[in-house]
Amino acid sequence: NDCDMYKILKKLGKCGCFAGVHCENAGVIDALIAEAKKEGRLGPENHPLVRPDTMEAEAVHRLLVIAKEADAPVMVVHLTNKKAFEEVMRARANGQEVYAETCPQYLEFTCDVYKREDGRNFVCSPPMKGQESQDALWKAIKNGMIDTVATDHCPFQSYEKDWGKDDFTKIPNGCPGVENLYPYMLDAANSGKITFERAVELCSTNVAKIFGCDNKGSISVGKDADIVIYDKDKDFTISVDNMHSDLDHTIWEGKQLHGYPIRTYLRGNVVYDNGDFVGTPGLGEYVKRSPRKH
């Protein structure tokens, strides 16, 4: 509730932290879901209808008003639509410290996917939105107005998605994405949609800066040697058959990429090489973060 949100944001601000917040108006959405069920509208094509742009934008607006009163920075996670983004820009214009994140699924797919036979596989919240919103997100990315691109990775197997084949409200919400984030954003750079520098900022540099990961985010003296080698001429088609995640489907099936990562170094150690994980179990380390200054 708003009272708790105010208290939490204020406490986090004083501690040098900030909250990443999922923004949708749950109360109105519950009412819209009840109306849809009463009217017998139970297919996945109704998922974006009961979670409209306005209910995300309203929640973003309310969050930012409360954050301003609490004098606290905040991040709006998995931003999906133009109206919600306009609320972020309005708050920034008033001097607020607001970060915005979006995800590849919102940059690639629109709400039309819910009309497909496999539409239930795309059910996530917030849902994919219309073409106008997708265009606005790409424009914001190009202009540097969106800070990071993440995945909201939350996969389910087909049998789990099938729980809602007769009632979209029973479909577990979430899609896979973590394995395809860098390939997708680097493909956008390779095709000229954005620059390679911008892709790196969105997926690495900005993330490290915002979250205080001082040893990460760039190739420079004193930083960890976390490096991706990218072959811009290698063609790759995403399929569940060539993914490393233990899944029986992916919403990215058949997506063609021009260019693909061929090697990954973690602190100077090769952990991925031409499609194979070659890292040693236990090589990972705790990443200490620095407190923020607001």
What is the predicted role of each segment?
Residues E24, T80, C103, C154, ...:
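Anionic group-transfer/hydrolysis microenvironments
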Residues N1-V149:
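Histidine/acidic residue-rich metal-binding segments in metalloenzymes
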Residues C124-P127, T151, R267, D273:
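Thr-Gly-centered strand-to-loop micro-motif
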Residues Y286-H294:
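Short, solvent-exposed cationic patches
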Residues D4, G177, L181, H244:
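Short acidic-hydrophobic sequence patches enriched in Asp/Glu that either
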